[in-house]
A protein has these predicted regions:
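Short, Lys/Arg-enriched N-terminal segment that forms or immediately precedes the first helix
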Residues: 1-2
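HTH-adjacent hinge/linker in prokaryotic transcriptional regulators
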Residues: 5-8, 18-25, 33-39, 45-105
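Glycine-rich phosphate/diphosphate-binding loops that line cofactor/substrate pockets in enzymes
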Residues: 102-114
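Glycine-rich phosphate-binding loops that contact phosphosugars or nucleotide phosphates
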Residues: 112-233, 237-246
Length: 249
């Protein structure tokens, strides 16, 4: 199934995110009336968001509110604060649930047996890349990071099959990273992708894909400063697992 939302489905998802506290109490008919969309649109949107249906989505929200987050000491908390907390909670929980253990194991092995590990990242994702660089170096791994677009493209053409590359990209469409990934793909260089976009171009070129959940809305819509929380979660799990594995050896 194509997970890309249509214009109407995107409108609905934005409506849901802006009314996230009320949604658990809505029926599908009421949501249809409030958002002025058909029930069929609601069902399609839920499917694309990897839910079985609207009831499944509501169940997830209720579970998150009643079990994972305790608001009992914040009875009068501002709705905006609650919405922000729930949005972050959703990114954490769904990212963890989406991770495939087999891919994490493959990534650990790829890093372990590489002579050198290169981390490529741009923009806000550079912060995640920097953390990965430091932690890999602390385990004794020969690792380096590059953020300059021209250097990234140049180095990607000089790697050997004994190297591995980690691409860190929220949307997986950054041009210089795509170019570098294609170079690695053509030269059969091992690659790992940390992203939050299931259908990205980078995903097509990378050998091992670790994909997290990214909420659609942004509280800073005029700027490219979207949350990298899903990438942070993936990076931490991968690096913690790698460090534990190296400690066992």
């Amino acid at each position: 199934m194509d997970h890309k939302l249509s214009e109407t489905e995107q409108y609905l998802w934005n409506f849901i995110e802006h009314h996230i506290l009320e949604i658990p109490n809505y029926s599908i008919v009421k949501l249809s009336e409030q958002a002025n969309v058909s029930t069929a649109t609601i069902v399609r949107t839920m499917k694309k968001k990897v839910y079985e249906g609207f009831t499944s989505f509501k169940h997830h929200l209720k579970e998150g509110e009643n079990k994972n987050i305790n608001f009992s000491f914040l009875d009068k908390v501002d709705k905006g604060i609650r919405r922000a907390i729930l949005k972050n909670e959703q990114e954490v929980v769904r990212t963890i649930n989406m991770l495939e253990i087999g891919n994490i194991e493959d990534a650990i092995q790829k890093i372990k047996f590489a002579d050198r590990v290169f981390v490529f990242a741009r923009g806000f994702s550079e912060m995640i890349g920097q953390e990965m660089l430091v932690k890999l170096q602390l385990t004794g791994k020969n690792c380096q990071m590059h953020t300059d677009p021209e250097i990234i493209k140049s180095i990607s053409q000089k790697l050997t099959k004994k190297d591995s590359v980690i691409f860190v990209s929220l949307n997986g469409e950054t041009k210089e990273l795509v170019t570098a990934a294609k170079n690695c793909y053509d030269a059969e260089i091992g690659s790992i992708l940390v992203t939050a976009n299931h259908s990205s171009t980078l995903k097509d070129y990378c050998e091992i894909n670790l994909v997290g959940f990214k909420s659609e809305g942004s509280y800073f819509p005029d700027y490219e400063v979207r949350s990298r929380l899903p990438l942070q979660i993936i990076a931490r799990i991968l690096l913690d697992a790698y460090a534990l594995r190296m400690g066992e050896n």
